[in-house]
């Protein structure tokens, strides 16, 4: 089979499209013929050897896939349409996947959209509904609202009845956030966002901040919290892991909440989150934002675009 293999921890330049043996499923796994695979910022970190999951080179990256089960397993039968998360190995024609990490893909959900589901949508749903306990009528600030997980969180917050603000880098990304329902969008390329946000909330701040960026953004986000506010720590796409000033949380009676899940510890919650997301999609309340579709052979170009912040929503590569 063909697969994109990383020979050394250095980045996408170390990727090569090679002919490699198909993986052999272990007990509890099935082989999936990949029809689409989604890109994540964590793929870039894994290629550089700085992600918390560090496979030994040579390895095949890729953590979100959708496709067709190639052989019968304990839970899945040959021909089933599925999507799921893998630790790595997704940028290949076939991948062995733990059966409990797959979910059935409805017939009306294209493989490209299915590949965009397994990571960002449960993350956004769990952050807002399980960790922050978001209620209708509350105010939410979504950082990087045009990105993959940001655009998911923006839509889920709107669907929950919240008033949503967003930050975005550039006018095109800001326009997308407005299209998705943000009440106001702050273009981070045009100046600071904290003061305008505080004006729009009459100095109160927001009930929830969804932060996948980290660094200085997190420090400013603590200042943006209202009393009893919740800061959701989703990731560090900006590259810097922040130190949160606990005295500011204390004075606002606020909380900083980490957002991390796994199938080993949170399987029922993840299953519930995915069911809720698919129901919202079926009702027309959200869109699974696949904004960039690339041929499998163009994976390297797609990763460069992601690294250079030239993408909105999700990027996927497709296979015949």
Q: Over which residues does each language-model region extend?
A:
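Glycine-rich phosphate-binding loop and adjacent beta-alpha segment
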Residues: 216-286, 319-320
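C-terminal capping/lid region of NAD(P)-dependent oxidoreductase domains
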Residues: 1, 283-290, 300-320
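NAD(P)H cofactor-binding loop motif with strongest signal on the N-terminal glycine-rich segment
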Residues: 144-145, 213, 236
């Amino acid at each position: 089979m063909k697969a994109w293999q990383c020979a050394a921890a250095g980045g996408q330049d170390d990727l090569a499209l090679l002919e490699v043996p198909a993986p052999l499923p272990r007990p509890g796994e099935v082989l999936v013929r990949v029809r689409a695979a989604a890109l994540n910022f964590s793929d870039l970190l894994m290629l550089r050897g700085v992600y918390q999951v560090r496979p030994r080179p040579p390895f095949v990256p890729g953590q979100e896939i959708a496709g067709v089960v190639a052989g019968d397993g304990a839970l899945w039968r040959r021909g089933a349409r599925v999507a799921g998360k893998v630790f790595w190995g997704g940028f290949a024609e076939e991948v062995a996947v733990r059966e409990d990490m797959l979910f059935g893909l409805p017939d009306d959900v294209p493989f490209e959209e299915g590949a965009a589901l397994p990571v960002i949508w449960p993350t956004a749903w769990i952050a807002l509904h399980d960790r922050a306990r978001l209620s209708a009528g509350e105010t939410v600030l979504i950082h990087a609202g045009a990105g993959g997980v940001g655009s998911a969180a923006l839509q889920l917050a709107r669907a929950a009845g919240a008033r949503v603000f967003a930050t975005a880098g550039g006018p095109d990304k800001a326009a997308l956030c407005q299209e998705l329902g943000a009440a106001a969008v702050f273009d981070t390329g045009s100046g600071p966002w904290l003061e305008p946000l505080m004006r729009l909330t009459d100095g109160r701040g927001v009930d929830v901040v969804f932060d996948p960026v980290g660094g200085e953004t997190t420090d400013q986000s603590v200042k943006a919290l209202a009393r009893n506010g919740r800061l959701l720590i989703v990731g560090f796409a900006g590259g810097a892991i922040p130190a949160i000033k606990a005295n500011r949380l204390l004075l606002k009676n606020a909380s900083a909440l980490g957002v991390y899940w796994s199938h080993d510890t949170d399987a029922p919650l993840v299953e519930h989150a995915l069911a809720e997301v698919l129901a919202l999609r079926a009702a027309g309340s959200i869109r699974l934002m696949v904004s960039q579709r690339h041929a499998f052979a163009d994976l390297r170009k797609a990763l460069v675009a992601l690294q250079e912040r030239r993408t909105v929503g999700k990027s996927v590569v497709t296979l015949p």
